[in-house]
Amino acid sequence: MDKRVSSIESLINLRFHVLSMLTYVELLKKLKEIKSSGWVKTHRTGNTGIGKTIEDLLGIKENNVPGPDAEKLELKSARKNAKSMLTLFTKSPLPPKANAVILARFGYAAENGRKELHTTLNAISHNLLRGCTGLKIKVDHSRIEIITENSEVLGYWDKDTLKKTFERKLPRLMYIKAESQGSGKNEEFWFNEAWLLQGFDFENFLKLLTAGVILVDIRIGQYPNGKPHDHGTGFRIQPNQLELCFSKREQIL
């Protein structure tokens, strides 16, 4: 057995029980075979095509599989040349009525006549909303805040809550990257890089957020009765920088 494979297996103690009881070593072998096979046509058009394709090639029906001690190991994949960002996790801000306040103050009319707000925030400067100064992220001592131009806090997340949310969502991750070419139904992928990631590095997460590398997407809509609907307030990062959120990074392909 390859010493590299052996050491990784010993370190991670990772076994997959996917459909046909695929073991970690067998999965690693399959990934190498997929890499050697070269370009593969997408199994689905659109942004989710890469995930569907690698799941089919690996024989996985969903994007997470049992990992160590029966804990879930999430499978994520990304195009190396992707311009779109990857969602780390979604979490509505506090207090409970924060979205209602933000929508009332900064929302605009959607095509259906109801209010909505789709905008991206960073921790470097206030964004622009309809030509006016909008919102900004502030990394405070104990929490992360959504603030106005006048430093009014409209919503926030406790740091401890965010840390636990990330650790629960992505405690361990298999991250597969692919070159891509073509578009639509003719898009092709070459899956040629894979990582095992674990140990959420919260301090680095805060540094990336402060530096504007991690962004916050606000997606608020409105029900017919006027109540706000959070479509997913997400913390997002460029796919090629996801590894920076983890303290233990092991390249396996």
Regions found by a protein language model. Give the residues of each.
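Nucleic-acid endonuclease domains
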Residues: 1-71, 77-253
